[in-house]
Amino acid sequence: MQERHTEQDYRALLIADTPIIDVRAPIEFEQGAMPAAINLPLMDNDERASVGTCYKQQGSDAALALGHKLVAGEIRQQRMYAWRAACLQNPQGILCCARGGQRSHIVQRWLHEAGIDYPLVEGGYKALRQTAIQATIELAQKPIVLIGGCTGSGKTLLVQQQPNGVDLEGLARHRGSAFGRTLQPQLSQASFENLLAAEMLKTDARQDLRLWVLEDESRMIGSNHLPECLRERMTQAAIAVVEDPFEIRLERLNEEYFLRMHHDFTHAYGDEQGWQEYCEYLHHGLSAIKRRLGLQRYNELAAQLDTALTTQLTTGSTDGHLAWLVPLLKEYYDPMYRYQLEKKAEKVVFRGEWAEVAVWVKAQ
């Protein structure tokens, strides 16, 4: 790849999930990175801070000299080993630093001296980030159909099954409710936006996309918020509402929040610690809405949750959770969603059970 990139080149990198060897410091990477990037820094956080201070006090030549002094000898050898291995594992990859400046050029030169020619992103992460932002703004202008419905309606699955669907909750690593956390930590806001842009670009590139199918989300999904350009378009979008029987919703919630989460926690942490993490996850979710439930109702539901967990631990049955889940849905989640839906009733264009909504969406 040439080192003078056009806008199309940057978009192509995101669409192809091109491996990116990001040589920025870890603190920069954590604040925002591209989806296919791995962080193999030229300088660690402390080294970067020292060079930055030197640059401000003594200028660029002194800072460059300090950088070479800090990244020398065994440290340089260790980092070269990691870069070489990454290049060999990702022959179609590309180097990236903050702005396509000295850091990526230095690593590129060192690799060349070691017999590896590897391209870099001219303009660096900043250019890719601006491309992601602009792509989201442009792609959000296409028509949108939102999938709505009460908790447990299978909205996310319906979106996932559409070729023009984008699973916002999956990208955010959060299901959007008090019980919405997953075992994967949420990304930084910038990384979430970059991932969303890449997913929209890939989805758009696979087909002659006429409209987006998205879940009816609020502005916040856990700690991530939707880009304003997309959120604004979603407030104007048509809504198809899934209205499944209450019992079907309970089955889905039992599978998703009790059976699957228990499995995921024990798979990640082992039986004993996994069980403790699972119990803490459910209690934390209930505690998050304590103020809205009121102390008395919260205490009642928390006691029922404890009883259900004891039953699940001793018998393996999750049926006991219905004692607190049913009133939580009927007294809190369902009224809250219906109230929110009433405020945008004029946007609702279709209602039906899950299969009916799926057929309707595919016909659009």
From Swiss-Prot:
It is an enzyme of class 2 (transferase). The active site is at residue 97. Coiled coil: none annotated. Pfam families: Rhodanese. Residues 14-137 form the Rhodanese domain. Its EC number is 2.9.1.3. It comes from the Bacteria. Keywords: Selenium, Transferase. One of its GO terms (biological process) is tRNA wobble uridine modification. It catalyses: 5-methylaminomethyl-2-thiouridine(34) in tRNA + selenophosphate + (2E)-geranyl diphosphate + H2O + H(+) = 5-methylaminomethyl-2-selenouridine(34) in tRNA + (2E)-thiogeraniol + phosphate + diphosphate; 5-methylaminomethyl-2-thiouridine(34) in tRNA + (2E)-geranyl diphosphate = 5-methylaminomethyl-S-(2E)-geranyl-thiouridine(34) in tRNA + diphosphate; 5-methylaminomethyl-S-(2E)-geranyl-thiouridine(34) in tRNA + selenophosphate + H(+) = 5-methylaminomethyl-2-(Se-phospho)selenouridine(34) in tRNA + (2E)-thiogeraniol; 5-methylaminomethyl-2-(Se-phospho)selenouridine(34) in tRNA + H2O = 5-methylaminomethyl-2-selenouridine(34) in tRNA + phosphate. Belongs to the SelU family. This is tRNA 2-selenouridine synthase. It comes from Shigella flexneri.
